[in-house]
């Protein structure tokens, strides 16, 4: 038994200390007892865990192994009767391994996700999903920088990630935000403790021809504690207690949700240098617009630019016409956020409050731009209302 579960024990021992131990924390203490060759202690702990969370199927599998180990050595994790479908056992093994990998590969102190360059002051948290680890990380906004506060096991699409069409049972990759809070009382039991829809497809998804809808963060049916790592129709699924905790961090309309293949962790200095580079480009764009030097302004736009209704040529013609009629322009930017786009090289989503004033028009709006590095310069490839 010790040999069969030693690796799990070592991994789960790395779980963060919490004021109130989560079921995952308690499972780690079971494996610690197994590693210490204390099977009776392990069995007592797993029984207590199952009593409190009788729908935690992975815990039942571990208990079965503990009982079997009394009579014979275990050759592998999940030794159960052949009457149990192998697919169900494989799902539980996959869940155990996903939890294991996440705990063994926790980020070092001081490392930051390269995906998060800047949060604006009203965004209290950002949620980042590492699909390779089946993990959702919650980061707090610490003066614009992300600070890791918690992480949770999640279930993703049956057919993996990078959703492209309706019904493909894949989870999208991209930068999104929570659009609503759907409470338990308004949903079927399937969605568990509630749901938080996100804005898939976003502007870039639509430009790339991706379709579909109804991608939510949600819970699980009451009969379950958790699901296999790849079991949803594309949604991000958490255990109900975890969803309830994550819900306390969510601000509808504000909380970003970034879904990636994996999180690349970096030092704070590197992330800050990347942020400053893009912030400088954004300021140069703003100043060029104010200057009414239209060619200088348009130099910030890629030849591949599209607003969704205008390509680069149409956009240029429109801006020449508009700016020629202005005597002065003032542009103010505030509440700026910057997020790298997963799986795209040097591609960043920038959102901000824009206060535009001229001799003929005053307008305030929230704007979103997609910036791409072309050679040595950052350029805008999409711009529109957020």
Predicted regions mapped to residue ranges:
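Alpha-helical segment of the N-proximal tetratricopeptide repeat
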Residues: 21-48, 52, 284-287
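Exported/periplasmic cell-wall-interacting domains
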Residues: 180-283
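Short beta-strand edge/turn micro-motifs at domain boundaries
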Residues: 364-386
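Gly/Pro-biased beta-strand-loop elements
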Residues: 104-215, 220-226
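Surface-exposed, charged secondary-structure patches
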Residues: 122, 320-368
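Short, aromatic-enriched amphipathic alpha-helices that serve as compact interaction elements
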Residues: 30, 274-292, 300
């Amino acid at each position: 038994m010790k040999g069969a579960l030693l690796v799990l024990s070592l991994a789960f021992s790395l779980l963060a200390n919490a004021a109130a131990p989560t079921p995952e924390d308690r499972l780690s203490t079971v494996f610690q007892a197994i590693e210490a060759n204390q099977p009776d202690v392990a069995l007592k702990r797993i029984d207590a865990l199952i009593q409190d969370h009788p729908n935690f199927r992975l815990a039942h599998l571990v208990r079965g192994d503990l009982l079997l180990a009394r009579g014979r050595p275990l050759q592998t994790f999940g030794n159960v009767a052949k009457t149990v479908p192998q697919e169900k056992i494989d799902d539980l093994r996959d869940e155990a391994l996903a939890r294991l990998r996440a705990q063994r590969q926790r980020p070092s102190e001081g490392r930051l996700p390269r995906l998060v360059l800047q949060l604006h002051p009203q965004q209290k948290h950002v949620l980042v999903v590492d699909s390779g680890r089946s993990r959702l990380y919650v980061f707090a906004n610490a003066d614009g920088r992300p600070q890791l506060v918690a992480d949770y096991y999640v279930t993703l699409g049956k057919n993996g990630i990078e959703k492209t069409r309706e019904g493909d049972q894949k989870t999208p990759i991209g930068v999104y935000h929570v659009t609503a809070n759907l409470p338990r009382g308004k949903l079927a039991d399937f969605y568990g403790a509630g749901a938080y829809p996100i804005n898939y497809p976003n502007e870039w998804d639509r430009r790339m021809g991706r379709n579909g809808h109804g991608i939510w963060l949600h819970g699980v049916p009451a009969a379950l504690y958790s699901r296999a790592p790849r079991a949803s129709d594309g949604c991000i699924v958490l255990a109900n207690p975890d969803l309830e905790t994550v819900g306390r961090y969510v601000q509808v309309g504000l909380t970003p949700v970034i879904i990636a293949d994996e999180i690349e962790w970096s030092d704070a200095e590197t992330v800050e240098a990347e942020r400053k580079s893009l912030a400088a480009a954004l300021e140069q764009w703003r100043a060029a617009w104010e200057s009414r030097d239209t060619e200088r302004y348009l130099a910030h736009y890629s030849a591949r630019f599209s607003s969704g209704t205008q390509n680069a040529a149409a956009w240029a013609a429109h801006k020449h016409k508009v700016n020629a009629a202005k005597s002065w322009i003032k542009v103010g930017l505030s509440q700026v956020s910057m997020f790298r786009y997963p799986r795209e090289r040097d591609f960043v989503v920038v959102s901000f409050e824009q206060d535009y004033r001229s001799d003929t028009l005053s307008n305030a709006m929230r704007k979103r731009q997609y910036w791409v590095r072309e050679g040595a310069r950052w350029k805008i490839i999409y711009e529109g209302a957020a």
